[in-house]
């Protein structure tokens, strides 16, 4: 950062009228001081040189401090924008990476779907059979609404079936078909134009071969992810507080895959990949480009993309401010460099006042009356310089404080959004897996053999291997007896807190039941959520014959969500003073990145904070455990259908905390 500012100092300064104005004022005062000192030297021969020499030394200290101030003003004005921009880029990249990881698991699971395999194994299919599978895929996309098409390809490129009936093509020449067949039983990720979606300039498609029971290739399954819709949602949320900027997803070859401003950065235009902060001129305008690449999630890193944020250089200082008092500046500890400059300028001004006072005493003793106006003028200049220092620092501190509060609020909202997005997937998984034909056929039988239990356990283990966010996945029957699990356990009765009983009362495949966040035997007596969906009889669609339970691996998953969104230092560690947690409406902690607050304990914030946060994310000062914090609270609002229209209610909050040193009342 410092090297970047030093390299582009004059360009940056030209876009910051406030900084330039302070520099001009200080230079004018310095010039006037020089002229007044010269007059003093000419007209004060009787005083000797000691006082004037002391004044010159003090003037030199002011000059050095002036350069330090201007450099810090440039640094901080630039830093407040770039740190926020960098954070937004990383947030967008992290959210997208998490989302795409789920897609890699989806394609692996769906490629083994019994109904899809049976359909593709037939040489010829009737309209009735096509309609049945089409409904099956419609149910899938009703759960996983992030897809805008599902396509089944024969090995020769024939389109056997597709969800989006608006496309009339019957054959595809897309190279992803052969690439997928070459890859074997792993997924292929394709991001470019595809004749499978001819109306799009760029598609993101996950594909994987489909095999029969003898491991003969039947064709290729393609899931078309609606990346434009997803990125529009992500970017729009991050640009609410930064509407003059634009964001783009850039591929490894420097092409724009998606942009928040299609006019200035159209899809497939060249933006170039950048490795670090960059000053770039585009269409007669200077931009600061911040960038973030994937940090990976569950060993998945994505296709080598990066997110860029372009902020016009002339908007760096267009930030509203909040009042910041001397106490806030000095005591919070949030602005150490600025506080040090302000303190030093005060000390230098005090020294100058003493020198002037000594000069007045010496002038009186030696009857050098002509020197008094010079001393008064220099005293006034010193006071004016200090006022410039003081006002410029206070203005900047107010700007930085505003940015700090905005950052905390944004991070809290992001944490809440990431949680909703993650748990949205969990609600989808349980409902879709409950429609698995082999699960339903097995539980529809009056008795299940040991061999069948073992086969079910193997299927569950395969799924669990794809979806590693679960501790275990299990099936239970209508008597609440454990039938099979991904860990090999069987037998026994489902515990009361698992939501299994509530699941057996469900009446629709689109419904699901979730346990409270309480300790569970299925999770080593640690608190977690268990997601359940009912299995319906294959022939009697209204009869519930059991359920599937998904034990969310909440401890590492929630912790990773919080850790990912917290600001990082240059070494990649969480910045000092920052912590975060998820809580329920009563303040009970679900997860925390702070040893002080463990799951099940209570974050002792006033209840009014949570009530006010329901209306809008907020930031407050508060004392916790004898320490002072800035606390941002954001409510979870749901994602797509999850907690918005699916009937599930569980109000949670994300809390971001920044510890500081002020000791005044809350």
PLM segments and residue spans:
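Extracellular/periplasmic juxtamembrane segments that couple receptor/chemosensory ectodomains to their
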Residues: 2-76, 263-403, 602-666
């Amino acid at each position: 950062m410092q090297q970047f500012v030093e390299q582009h100092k004059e360009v940056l300064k030209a876009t910051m009228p406030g900084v330039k104005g302070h520099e001009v004022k200080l230079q004018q005062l310095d010039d006037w001081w020089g002229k007044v000192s010269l007059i003093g030297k000419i007209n004060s021969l009787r005083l000797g040189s000691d006082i004037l020499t002391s004044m010159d030394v003090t003037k030199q200290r002011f000059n050095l401090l002036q350069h330090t101030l201007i450099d810090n003003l440039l640094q901080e004005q630039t830093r407040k924008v770039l740190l926020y921009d960098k954070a937004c880029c990383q947030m967008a990249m992290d959210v997208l990476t998490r989302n795409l990881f789920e897609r890699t698991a989806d394609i692996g699971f769906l490629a083994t779907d019994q109904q899809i395999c049976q359909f593709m194994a037939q040489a010829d299919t009737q309209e009735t059979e096509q309609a049945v599978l089409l409904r099956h895929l419609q149910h899938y996309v009703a759960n996983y609404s992030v897809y805008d098409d599902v396509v089944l390809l024969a090995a020769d490129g024939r389109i056997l079936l597709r969800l989006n009936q608006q496309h009339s093509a019957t054959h595809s020449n897309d190279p992803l078909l052969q690439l997928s067949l070459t890859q074997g039983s792993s997924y292929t990720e394709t991001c470019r134009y595809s004749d499978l979606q001819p109306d799009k300039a760029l598609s993101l498609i996950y594909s994987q071969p489909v095999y029969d029971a003898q491991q003969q290739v039947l064709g290729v399954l393609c899931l078309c992810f609606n990346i434009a819709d997803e990125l529009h949602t992500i970017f729009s949320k991050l640009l609410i507080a930064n509407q003059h900027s634009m964001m783009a997803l850039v591929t490894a070859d420097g092409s724009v895959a998606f942009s928040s401003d299609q006019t200035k950065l159209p899809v497939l235009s060249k933006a170039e990949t950048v490795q670090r902060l960059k000053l770039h001129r585009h269409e007669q305008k200077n931009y600061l480009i911040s960038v973030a690449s994937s940090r990976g999630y569950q060993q998945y890193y994505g296709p080598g993309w990066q997110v860029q944020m372009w902020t016009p250089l002339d908007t760096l200082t267009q930030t509203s401010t909040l009042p910041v008092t001397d106490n806030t500046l000095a005591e919070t500890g949030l602005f150490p460099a600025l506080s040090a400059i302000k303190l030093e300028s005060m000390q230098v001004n005090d020294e100058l006042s003493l020198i002037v006072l000594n000069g007045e005493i010496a002038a009186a003793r030696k009857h050098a009356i002509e020197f008094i106006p010079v001393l008064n003028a220099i005293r006034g200049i010193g006071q004016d310089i200090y006022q410039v220092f003081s006002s410029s620092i206070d203005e900047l501190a107010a700007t930085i404080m505003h940015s700090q509060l905005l950052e905390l609020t944004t991070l809290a909202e992001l944490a809440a959004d990431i949680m909703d997005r993650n748990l949205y997937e969990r609600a989808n998984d349980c409902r879709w897996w409950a429609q698995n034909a082999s699960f339903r056929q097995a539980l529809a039988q009056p008795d299940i053999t040991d061999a069948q239990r073992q086969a079910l356990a193997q299927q569950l283990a395969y799924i669990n291997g794809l979806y590693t966010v679960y501790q275990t996945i299990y099936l239970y029957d209508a008597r609440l007896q454990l039938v099979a699990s991904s860990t090999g356990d069987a037998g026994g009765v489902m515990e009361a807190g698992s939501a299994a009983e509530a699941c057996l009362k469900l009446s629709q495949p689109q419904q699901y039941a979730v346990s409270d966040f309480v300790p569970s035997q299925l999770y080593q007596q640690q608190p977690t959520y268990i997601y359940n969906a009912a299995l319906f009889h294959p022939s009697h669609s209204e009869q519930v014959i059991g359920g599937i339970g998904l034990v969310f691996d909440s401890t590492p998953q929630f912790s990773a969500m919080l850790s990912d969104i917290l600001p990082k230092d240059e070494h990649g560690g969480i910045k000092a003073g920052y912590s975060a947690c998820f809580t329920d409406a009563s303040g009970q902690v679900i997860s925390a990145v702070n040893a002080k607050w463990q799951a099940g304990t209570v974050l002792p914030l006033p209840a009014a904070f949570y009530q006010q946060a329901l209306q809008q994310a907020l930031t407050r000062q508060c004392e916790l455990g004898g320490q002072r914090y800035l606390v941002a609270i954001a409510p979870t609002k749901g994602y797509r259908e999850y907690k918005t229209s699916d009937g599930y209610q569980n109000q949670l909050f994300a809390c971001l905390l920044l510890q500081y040193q002020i000791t005044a009342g809350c």
